[in-house]
């Protein structure tokens, strides 16, 4: 590892910064290093919050780092915040990297503020789920870049996305680091170019921080595996073709969203684009490659059937009060988008699992664990959003129908939470390890350009 000294000097964090705290730290940094730091406001969020871009260095190469591409993913905000500090403090590092850095600590401030209820802890599955928010796909900064592919036509980028579009168009970056993270599982990565030497550094970093690799089911069934826990950067076109092959519906009507920064950048440049996913919670089974006694296809199909049943019960409760929810909000849009698109996505996964030869083998313990335990964890997050939406609606219109719906949804949430926790032996990963892993992965990658 080339950057061991930097990683060993990382401080401890016991919480995540709020959007306002990140902004204040940016202003403080600019005041402390006025000759090294330039801060500009390159746009505003939908709610009018300024999006600050930090420029550091005058290198020949250009790197674009942006955090909170999904607002429930704040690990990268600490990475960007700390990287800005060390670039100002370490002239030798900045000169050796020969890169002009453009850093955005939070590209979705509105959505991130809606997650701040869990940023200070306690870091439990329940508190995370009850305070979780993730927008509908077409309102996600990462997936609202323009695209025109077959029947998929999307040209409604968010104001936040337009900030990234302009930076990509103007800078033609050599390196784009979209600072995502997962919720539960292990470390895995998406990369736009096949760099075997970097895979070794990823594994070395995971070993350094005692973090498991995610060796179970891939996040996306169509992801192309380059190495253990490393996948070729997916495109919206890949998602389209997967749906075209596995459903009888128009993929454009199922996706209803745009491209990513990676897809958009291909029109202007060919940057090394990286995502290093890592979780808040983990269980030792996520990287257990020993064989289970369950066929992988059976594990996947059982998971999809459980998802359908949960979806149906939740949709039934929601439909009772849906007509009374009259306000517009990002929570409502997210929940209703899930209800609208989930059946077709489940059908596509079923079709794929039924015919894929990869499903004929015995599932590893990691694959079985993903299907039986990790997937229900993510369903709990949807349940949390439904509860938040119902609370939001009742606050605007305190009618008894909402009381009954909230009681029913709360019962479903509690039962599902109990089942999820009973099936997990989870630990909370120290934030310092997560920051070190993601920061180290990025530094090692850009050094290979």
Where are these regions (language model features)?
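C-terminal accessory segments enriched in acidic
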Residues: 1-16, 156, 160, 196-449
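Short glycine- and acidic-rich boundary segments immediately preceding or forming the N-terminal edge
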Residues: 1-51
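Short beta-strand-to-loop junctions in surface cap/lid or active-site-entrance loops
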Residues: 52-60
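Active-site/substrate-binding loop(s) of hydrolase catalytic cores
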Residues: 60-62, 75, 88-199, 203, ...
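Short glycine-rich or small-residue beta-strand-to-loop segments that form or flank ligand, phosphate
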Residues: 64-69
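Catalytic metal-binding/acid-base residues of hydrolase active sites
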Residues: 70, 108, 182, 219, ...
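Di-metal (Zn2+ and/or Mg2+/Mn2+) metal-binding site signature of metallo-dependent hydrolases
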Residues: 70-77
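Short, well-ordered amphipathic alpha-helices
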Residues: 80-89
